[in-house]
Design a protein with these regions (language model features):
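Glycine-rich active-site/cofactor-binding loop and its immediate structural neighborhood
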Residues: 73-115
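Short, conserved beta-strand segments within well-ordered enzyme catalytic domains
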Residues: 50, 65-67, 76-80, 106-110, ...
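An N-cap/entry alpha-helix motif that binds or orients negatively charged groups
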Residues: 1-71, 169, 176-234, 372-373, ...
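Alpha/beta catalytic cores of nucleotide-metabolism and tRNA/nucleoside-modifying enzymes
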Residues: 1-47, 291-390
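A gly/proline- and charged-residue-enriched helix-loop-helix capping module
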Residues: 102-123, 127-142
Length: 390
């Protein structure tokens, strides 16, 4: 396939996408919490590692495929769930699903998508889908969504566990971020219609609060800012409830950054975890996901799969994450940049760039199978500039 000479790297894709997004959308997708240090460190963590290639190996046939969620994925990465994709392009999540289908890559869908989970599932064909999930304080809303995902054929629900409260994103506050009136949170449109029939003018949403000792639940149309946070969740109650409710779908947790929580995830019989800090959008100063990965891999000890997201901007980053013990990677912002740049074709470009870079990295490293990637192919750059073997 011919190269897009305007865009040969993910960095160039970001620049091109920035030119096509309005300020509110650009800031919403790209901003991190507070000063944004975790967003930057998610990326810079990969620069701490150097590659140790092996030579004089036959790499004429390189197989980059892996099995994930019971299907063969063309590369060891998927498209991470990201909310409200019609902000970037009118086709939104449908463009993402079609691009994933064309490239043989698994897609995650946000609960707060601007396309229904059923329409995304149809557009995905035989490519597996996962549904990112929040457990709302009004559990009925979550239960409805889980049942719809089950009926539509989703392979797993992925519970976001790092949002007991919402991180502070200053540009969202300054821009007074809101979804444009022509768009809606599609998976909760029925609930929206209920409020539309009882209110004249704008439909209000309110977050939960306490009246004395009584907790008043979120009200109004379901939005991330009013309903996404849930400070009442606990290991003892939420995980058993979700496993029972979601069966036979798998239950994964996204937002684990410590070995202690990884061990609790194993103890509570979840099917897998995603090492994630919400793209640096929740708690600024959190461990970069790549820095957290080795501790979590050791704690899990191969009892369940360990995936990772955050900061990946090149195929070699994927190689490094796998070498440190990740089983699979998820790509977020670069896919949104592809969507903003050129819809489905832009996402396909993003996925092709990362896939080509990863396969080239495999070959130049002397590796022909993903399962052969290990720590022996990395060394770490120390603060004094010296390299140390892992």
């Amino acid at each position: 396939m011919a190269h897009d000479l305007n865009c040969l790297t993910i960095a160039e894709l970001e620049v091109l996408a920035t030119e096509r997004m309005d300020k509110q959308t650009r800031d919403y997708y790209n901003e991190g919490a507070d000063g944004g240090s975790t967003v930057r460190e998610n990326m810079s963590a990969y620069k701490k590692y150097r590659l140790r290639p092996r030579v004089l190996r036959n790499v004429s046939k390189v197989d980059s495929s892996v099995e994930v969620l019971g299907a063969r994925n063309s590369v060891p990465f998927g498209v991470a769930p990201a909310a409200m994709q019609k902000l970037a392009h009118p086709d939104g999540e449908l463009a993402t699903a079609r691009a994933c289908k064309s490239k043989g890559i698994v897609m995650g869908l946000s609960s707060f998508s601007t396309t229904t989970l059923e329409d995304v599932r149809t557009a995905s064909g035989n490519i597996p889908n996962i549904l990112q999930l929040y457990l709302f304080e009004n559990r009925q809303h979550s239960s409805k969504l889980i049942q719809r995902a089950k009926q539509a054929g989703y392979k797993a629900v992925v519970l976001t566990v790092d949002t007991p409260l919402l991180g502070r994103r200053n540009l969202e506050i300054r821009n007074q971020f809101h979804l444009p009136s022509h768009l809606k949170i599609a998976n909760f449109a029925d609930e929206d219609d209920i409020y539309a029939s009882t209110w004249a003018g704008p439909r209000p949403s309110s977050a939960a609060f306490y009246e004395g000792d009584h907790r008043v639940l979120p009200a109004g149309p379901i939005t991330f800012h009013s309903h996404g946070a849930n400070p009442t969740l606990s290991w003892e109650e939420a995980i058993p409830w979700l496993k029972q409710e979601a069966s036979p779908m798998q239950v994964w947790l996204k937002g684990i950054v410590t070995g202690e929580d990884a061990q609790l995830a194993v103890a509570h019989n979840v099917d897998g975890i995603i090492v994630s800090n919400h793209g640096g959008r929740q708690l600024d100063g959190t461990l970069a996901t790549l820095d957290a990965l080795p501790e979590i891999v050791a704690a899990v000890d191969r009892r369940i799969p360990v995936h990772i997201d955050g900061g990946i901007r090149h195929g070699a980053d994927i190689f490094k994450a796998l070498a440190l013990g990740a089983d699979f990677c998820w790509i977020g912002r670069p896919v949104l940049w592809g969507l903003a740049y050129d819809g489905q074709a832009g996402i396909e470009l993003c996925l092709r760039l990362l896939s080509d870079e990863f396969r080239l990295c495999m070959g130049l490293m002397g590796v022909t199978k993903v399962s052969d990637i290990s720590r022996e192919y990395l060394c770490r750059m120390k603060r004094d500039g010296l390299l140390s073997r892992l």
